[in-house]
Amino acid sequence: MKKAAFLDRDGVINVDRGYVGKIEDFSWCDGVFEGLLRLKELGFELVIITNQSGIARGYYSEADFKSLTKWMLTGLEKQGISVLKVYHCPHAPELGCECRKPKPGMILKAASELEIDLKNSILIGDKDSDIAAGLSAGVGANFKLGKDFASLKEVAFSLKIK
């Protein structure tokens, strides 16, 4: 079984400007490439899990999201970074679906589909809902950006893996 780094997208991979669904709205967070490369060096597979209620709200389409995701993954690949898979929840919060964080649906689906060992995995997010999803799914270590860490890069370089 693999160990993974579950990563929120908005606020971790890219600057969160609210409902980032199009390429022109996307800006990489500082240090993201170095941080992701470090996670790969430590043996983590990268899995992105992202709430995208902007789709349900009509701010952008599923096609816009897929186009942006393809562009983002290409940008990461140019830096030598491969992402195992991107999971997203397109639903509005009031729907009460199982995939939207803080529920653990996306993480549990990834663990099942990709044969991930949750206890030896980590999650990096910027919201309480990210951390709640990780805790509920049984992810071994959960890191919230803001209070203790300013960036994904800081988290990645603070990890001590045996």
Q: Where do the language-model regions lie?
A:
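Active-site neighborhood of HAD-like aspartate-dependent phosphohydrolases
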Residues: 1-45
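Asp-based, Mg2+/Mn2+-dependent phosphohydrolase catalytic module
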Residues: 3, 63, 67-84, 92-123, ...
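A short alpha-helix capping/helix-coil boundary motif
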Residues: 12-16, 51-53, 85-88, 109-111
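Short, active-site-adjacent cap segments at secondary-structure transitions
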Residues: 13-14, 53-57, 93-95, 130-131
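Gly/Ser/Thr-rich beta-alpha loop segments that engage phosphate groups in nucleotides
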Residues: 20, 56, 60, 127
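Flexible, glycine- and charge-enriched loops at secondary-structure boundaries
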Residues: 22-29, 61-66, 100
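Substrate-recognition element of Asp-dependent hydrolases with the DxDx(T/V) motif
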Residues: 32, 36-69, 81-92
